[in-house]
Amino acid sequence: MVLSAISVIILGFLVAYGLLGYLFGFAYTSIIVTGALAFVTFFTIIQWLLGPLMIKAAYRLIEVKADDPTYGWVYNLVQEVATYNNMSMPKVYVAPVNFPNAFAFSSPLFGKNMAITTPLINILNKDEIKAVIGHEIGHLRHRDTEILLAVSLIPTLMYWLGYSLWWGGLLGGGGGGRNSNSGLLFLIGIVLIAVSFVFNIFVLFLNRMREAYADVNSALTIPNGASNLQTALAKIVIYTDPGIVDRVKQKSGGVAKMLLFSGTDVSNEEIPSYKAQELVNYWRTQKVGILSDLFSDHPHPAKRIKLLDKFTQAQWSPVA
């Protein structure tokens, strides 16, 4: 997937370079296309290599070791799940922030990493935490960070190339080109910008696919992973929207989307499983449209629950 994305980027670069060089002159085109490519590639590589540093700073991550008196058991859970997945142990962090979440990130310089926020640790039981870890380990196993970063290069490059051509058209084109048609240059820029936004919808779709794939990884490699991940997802939503269960009972109001966090001051204790199960049962019967999560990077919760239902009776087994 990564190599395919890189191939598409290179091919698109060559096609754009040839077409624009023919229309507007290769000297002018070289400045625009090469400049846009260099700009996007440079900042993407920096983001990939140094991203973990930015994440650690933004979330104030605290590294956890096996002998940690407070969170050593979290380290042990990650180690257990990594063993199930036949994967090397990632670095484990706890994030002292005010919303429940877990996330994995990696780079060639800083290796594989996983972070869990303190509210998530507080509101889930250990089996549910293990299922969430199985989801995040799935992201690391499948190299989702690298795949999504490579694919997202395509619309980013399209946008900046289009933006450069748009300004080139406004400023009068290349001057020495075959046609010196600034209007056509402007039009090509607008089209590329529009296509970049459309392609971003595909990137979101791919992101949702990777999330679903990570859910399946947890279901297949963790004992009772599917059912525990279901209640974990429900508890996260209940934490961010405490009134959702009552609204579901009354059949009024919508369901909160996954990972829409708020600063609501709610109990920082484990959420009762029966409340989570009520929400899971509602999602099982909720009808959601194809476009319900079109602009989201996560599948609608109801879709995730229904997918996990297919694996609740599956025989789990460690990865060979």
Curated annotation (Swiss-Prot):
Q: Which UniProt keywords apply?
A: Cell membrane, Hydrolase, Membrane, Metal-binding, Metalloprotease, Protease, Transmembrane, Transmembrane helix, Zinc
Keyword Disulfide bond attached: no
Question: Which InterPro entries has this protein been placed in?
Answer: HtpX_protease, Pept_M48_protease_HtpX, Peptidase_M48
| Principal subcellular localization | membrane
Q: Which domain of life is it from?
A: Archaea
Q: Could you name the active-site residues? A: 136
Q: Which residues cross the membrane?
A: 6-26, 31-51, 147-167, 185-205
Entries under CDD domains matching the protein: M48B_HtpX_like
GO terms of biological process kind: proteolysis
Enumerate the subcellular locations listed in this protein's record, separating them with semicolons.
Cell membrane
Where Zn(2+) binds, per the record, is at 135, 139, 211
Question: Which E.C. number(s) belong to this protein?
Answer: 3.4.24.-
**In the record's cofactor note, how is the cofactor described as bound?**
Binds 1 zinc ion per subunit.
> Which cofactors must be present for this protein to function?
Zn(2+)
| Membrane topology (UniProt) | Multi-pass membrane protein
State a single Gene Ontology molecular function: metalloendopeptidase activity
What Pfam families does the record point to? Answer: Peptidase_M48
Report one GO cellular component: plasma membrane
Q: Which family does it belong to?
A: Belongs to the peptidase M48B family.
Q: What is this protein called?
A: Protease HtpX homolog 2
Q: What is the organism of origin for this protein?
A: Sulfolobus acidocaldarius (strain ATCC 33909 / DSM 639 / JCM 8929 / NBRC 15157 / NCIMB 11770)
Q: Quick one: which gene encodes this?
A: htpX2
